[in-house]
Amino acid sequence: MVFTQDGNATYMKTKLYYNESSESKFLADILKHKLEREGIIVGDETPEIGIAIGGDGSFLHMVAANDFNTDILYIGVNNGTLGFLTEIKPTELNYFTDVIKNSNYKLEHISYEEVKVVAENGEYNFKTLNEVVVRDEYLSTTYLKVTVDDKLLENFVGDGLLVSTPTGSTAYNLSGNGAIVYSDLHTMQITPLAPINNKVYRCITNPIVLPESKVIKLYPIERTKDLIILADGKKYTIKDAKHVEIKICKDKLKCIRLNDYDYTTIINDKYLS
């Protein structure tokens, strides 16, 4: 039995998601025992609270396994990796159990992307919490016409384009020299991957941050016809692609945050401390 924020008693259903590492399994067993001891249900059905144990990959798997269900509250327990999405430390399991039991937390609403690829043989749809990467299938130079709300932004030439959410700004985007965006903002960021600039081709070489109302479309041009789509790290090959449409979903995922959660402190802790 747990207590809601208005003081009423209820039964809370949770589900644990973890990878196959021995450390994650060990933490899952400990946490399951602690939660059940407090009357919190741990099961396999669709939960009210989803708890990922591991690194950011475990968190992404949890959200995808629930098809980005926006009724679920999501949170992660870090098992020692960098983990921007997994906030709880293994040493905080007792405190975390009390937090869940007493609903003593705040909620942050975070954005995810809807990606639609239109090809000669049909339409493909993806959802991404971190990013989508669009490249030439053969990993040769990628040629893409880029539009925002159907207005030309540029004709890109380079390795590919990465479009990330604020949550994904600290993942692959950061390796591509993209900007860190605070997780409670609702934006998209276009980050060029190895853009080519010479007297023949001129590309924007800096990341561009767009508001959530915008719709990005990428059209294969010149020698690019077949695409590789990386959606949160999962690879898909699309033959004879016509265009890729990327936008922020109007619905938001709900993430549990501890009351002392502070993104500035997290950035400092992950990169500088």
List each language-model region with its residue ranges.
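N-terminal amphipathic/basic-hydrophobic helices that include classical n-h-c signal peptides
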Residues: 1-11
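Catalytic phosphate-donor-binding core of small-molecule kinases
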Residues: 11-44, 83-160, 170-273
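Active-site catalytic pocket residues across diverse enzymes, especially alpha/beta-hydrolases
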Residues: 35, 66-67
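Short, well-ordered secondary-structure micro-motifs within conserved domains or adaptor modules
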Residues: 44-62
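Short glycine-rich anion-binding loops that position phosphate/pyrophosphate groups of nucleotides
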Residues: 55-58, 80, 167-169
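Short Gly/Thr/Asp-enriched flexible loops that form oxyanion-binding sites at enzyme active sites
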Residues: 61-66, 173-177
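Proline-centered loop/turn at the N-terminus of a beta-strand
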Residues: 72-73
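Conserved beta-strand-loop-short alpha-helix elements that form
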Residues: 163-164
